[in-house]
């Protein structure tokens, strides 16, 4: 068309607007990450939340650049020749995406996860969140709920206590600070020495579950269930979490099974009750509560009292489990205020909110955020279930603005939002028909294939390299510490980056017992030396630096 501007269809304009908004979001995230780099966030720091900013500074520049370039290329194609694209496709392109793609996605995702888990010294528990649930699982295997401390020295109960393991009310035992169901599920895998297999199987189940939910929503002959399964399977965060013993893959699977039950025919919805009990007691009730709340609110609005009462009964049972487990420790529940885990957000947390959204997108396959935005832009076309999925994502973002450790500390991708990855995949699939209509079937599938290839063969290996870089020093240092002959080893926890995470002891306090050097007083040290009849060994910083553990910078004098 010469001499006049082409009048674009509404679909073209909405797609272009979605691309532009995504580019703005990624660009804003890039500016924040650049600021972290310039302020030295790539180096070690003593703050417990600093690892979040360090991972952003070290790990995000390349994925952000790749997401930006990919989106620019899609925008260029849509703007340059949208009319021709929609009518150009090969005969084979009209065939729906078959279930074989789902099977291939499961196989490839599991293979990559296996490789990374083995490379991580058998999914070494880099974070104390991972170690604590395994600690509790080992207690269950020994036939105990609480680990009775085998010591006559009272102060050892604290100076030897690992992070996220808490003293019981009487002070004579230890118990995990997390709810018990995930540790129960972990037991057979911990017993055979492959605890990470649980999350690998959870991932396989999640891909199959999201495809099943997609077929419930859109029918078996639609491309969207397969697109949702591929979107989930190719997510770097999805694969990375399965190479760990974080509880998040289990949360994701149970949420998807719960949704499948709610959407099922006949009396299938009855399974939503016991599944809610499992989900609410995996390790924390919040991940499932945020996911399920919009669906439960809709039951109230539609006056579906029967289903609501059934699920509420199981929620009450879950609350009893939470109260009982809390009673094993201090009996305190999360509260607002200076001493609670919840607090009122401030302006700085809005920046963290932006970063959470960015991580949710940049750890996904590059096309998926665009498809999700396209689908959500057509809000009037979304079904009740699709809207509830979107509301669950928004609720998760909003809740963690009020969480004291809003930056999540350790975690690959946006760990706090892992339970909504299925929602992201399903909402991304809602944008697929419009994207395909604008760019054409053949072009759409090519962009999808490129997105999946970049995620699996470029982004995930990049993420895995960072996981290895950060985790292996702690794995090797931990093995070395466990091989030392002394009864007590004092770790210079205040001089090492995340030095407190090296203190990992069973309740039996088998040798060597690792101690928090920062918490041990001189008098307590003398008591230990007198008990042993020989000096307690102080581990030097240089002894641990040989494995790659980093020294903390000395604080500036005031």
Identify the residue ranges that each predicted region occupies:
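Signature aromatic-anchored transmembrane alpha helix within multi-pass, membrane-resident enzymes
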Residues: 97-107, 226, 270, 311-319, ...
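Transmembrane-helix signature of polytopic, membrane-embedded enzymes
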Residues: 102-105, 210-236, 252-253, 266-271, ...
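Hydrophobic, aromatic-rich transmembrane alpha-helices
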Residues: 1-3, 71-80, 205-211, 292-302, ...
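Transmembrane alpha-helix segments characteristic
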Residues: 26-33, 103-113, 226-228, 232, ...
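Multi-pass, polyprenyl lipid-linked donor-dependent membrane glycosyltransferases
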Residues: 128, 196-208, 227-257, 262, ...
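Hydrophobic/aromatic-rich transmembrane helices and adjacent perimembrane loops
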Residues: 133-134, 248, 388-391, 409-436
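Interfacial juxtamembrane loops and adjacent helix segments
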Residues: 142-182, 186, 340
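Membrane-lumen/periplasm interface segments of specific transmembrane helices
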Residues: 280-374, 396
